[in-house]
């Protein structure tokens, strides 16, 4: 059974000004060191907190790469939860589960004309290797049984519902279009059903 291992308080975000808690876990089904970032008392209330399941993206989250919108989505979640409370489930699933080096290899193939899924397939991987079951385990360990999910990805909604967690509402993330990521976003919408709103 998954249980909270350690929970600490710290400040995060720009200028380290946003109070939050970081929780680690024992008993996850993989050896990945996933964490939960808790804002306010989202894990102590009986209502339906806002939750974002966010897969690690070093190039986007840390270096704000122009190739994706991951960093902007993470920043948006932090800003929203600073005001409303909530929980970010941060999963160590770099490159939709293929790892950082393989993702960089995939980027090279994309530069040669492949889309994000074709590149993964060329490297011998499926379109998306992520499993969101552990997100359900972590939320259950935090006593979260119902929530509002901040996502454009229907697979995350499906995974939580299959785990027995009630998704009261799906909140779409904003669309962050940059010169280098429009094709990537349109491919996710077309191939994986992401509910991305394009202005044109």
From Swiss-Prot:
Pfam families recorded for this chain? Answer: GTP_cyclohydro2
Where along this sequence does the record place binding of GTP? 52-56, 73, 94-96, 116, 151, 156
Q: Which cofactor does it need?
A: Zn(2+)
Q: Which GO terms describe its cellular component?
A: cytosol
The UniProt catalytic activity note for this protein reads: GTP + 4 H2O = 2,5-diamino-6-hydroxy-4-(5-phosphoribosylamino)-pyrimidine + formate + 2 phosphate + 3 H(+)
Give the pathway. Answer: Cofactor biosynthesis; riboflavin biosynthesis; 5-amino-6-(D-ribitylamino)uracil from GTP: step 1/4
- Report the superkingdom from the record: Bacteria
InterPro entries xrefs = GTP_cyclohydro_II, RibA, RibA-like_sf
Per the UniProt entry, the Enzyme Commission number(s) are: 3.5.4.25
Gene Ontology BP annotations? riboflavin biosynthetic process
Binding site residues for Zn(2+): 57, 68, 70
Q: How is the cofactor bound?
A: Binds 1 zinc ion per subunit.
What residues make up the catalytic site?
128 (proton acceptor), 130 (nucleophile)
Keywords recorded for this protein, A-Z: GTP-binding, Hydrolase, Metal-binding, Nucleotide-binding, Riboflavin biosynthesis, Zinc
Q: Listed GO molecular functions?
A: GTP binding; GTP cyclohydrolase II activity; zinc ion binding
Spell out the PANTHER family in the cross-references: 3,4-DIHYDROXY-2-BUTANONE 4-PHOSPHATE SYNTHASE (PTHR21327:SF18), GTP CYCLOHYDROLASE II-RELATED (PTHR21327)
Entry similarity comment: Belongs to the GTP cyclohydrolase II family.
Give the matching NCBIfam families: PRK00393.1, ribA
Role summary: Catalyzes the conversion of GTP to 2,5-diamino-6-ribosylamino-4(3H)-pyrimidinone 5'-phosphate (DARP), formate and pyrophosphate.
What is the name of the protein in this document? GTP cyclohydrolase-2
């Amino acid at each position: 059974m998954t249980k909270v291992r350690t929970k600490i308080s710290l400040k995060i975000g720009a200028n380290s000004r946003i109070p939050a808690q970081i929780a680690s876990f024992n008993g996850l089904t993989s050896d990945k060191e996933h964490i939960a970032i808790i804002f306010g008392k989202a894990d102590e209330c009986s209502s339906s907190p806002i939750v974002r399941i966010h897969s690690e993206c070093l190039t986007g989250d840390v270096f704000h790469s122009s190739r994706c919108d991951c960093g902007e989505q993470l920043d948006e979640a932090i800003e929203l939860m600073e005001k409303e409370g909530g929980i970010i489930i941060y999963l160590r699933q770099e490159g939709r589960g293929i790892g950082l080096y393989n993702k960089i290899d995939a980027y090279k193939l994309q530069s040669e004309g492949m889309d994000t899924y074709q590149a993964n397939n060329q490297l011998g991987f499926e379109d998306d290797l992520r499993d969101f079951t552990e997100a359900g385990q972590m939320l259950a360990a935090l006593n979260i049984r119902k929530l509002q999910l901040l996502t454009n990805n229907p697979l995350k909604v499906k995974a939580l519902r299959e785990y027995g967690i009630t998704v009261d509402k799906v909140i779409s993330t904003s669309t962050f279009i940059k010169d280098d990521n429009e094709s990537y976003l349109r491919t996710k919408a077309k191939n994986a059903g992401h509910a991305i709103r394009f202005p044109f």
